[in-house]
Design a protein with these regions (language model features):
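Binding-site signature for planar aromatic cofactors or substrates
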Residues: 1-142
Length: 142
């Protein structure tokens, strides 16, 4: 089915759904991110899509400003599929979850990977530094 067929079948998006899309973080989205202890990050290298779960105690994603968030990448299975995808294609999509909350928050943006010691230090957990930090500039928030 193409877009016209789908729109004819489903109709237009509701005004409320269309209006909630923002280009940067607002106070509600910042609060949601700060309360989240789990997210899934989607990346694409031009050929393959990867969905990477990320979790730590709430507040593990640092909101630096309305147009910069940082996510520590801690050692795990070392597949680093998402990081490899970001190195080829900066576009990422995140969905944040909060336990027992039915609402989610989605953030799309452009990502870079940092191993700057000053950036890593902000993400220290129990004296352990992450290997890298994913820095995201949101382009769409809803």
């Amino acid at each position: 089915m193409d877009e016209i067929q789908l729109r004819n079948l489903y109709g237009p998006a509701t005004e409320k759904a269309s209006a909630k899309i923002m280009k940067s973080l607002d106070p509600h989205s910042v609060s949601f991110i700060n309360a989240s202890n789990f997210l899934v990050m989607g990346t694409f290298d031009g050929e393959d899509i990867d969905l990477s779960p990320k979790g730590d105690p709430k507040g593990f994603v640092k909101v630096i400003s309305d147009d910069r968030i940082e996510i520590a990448d801690r050692p795990g299975n070392n597949r680093i599929d998402g990081l490899l995808n970001i190195s080829k294609n900066a576009t990422v999509s995140l969905i944040f979850f909060i336990p027992k909350v039915t609402e989610t928050l989605r953030v799309q943006g452009k990502a870079t990977i940092s191993n700057d010691p000053k950036v890593l230090e902000k993400h220290k957990l129990k004296s352990n530094l992450p290997k890298t930090v994913i820095v995201i500039k949101p382009t769409k928030v809803f």
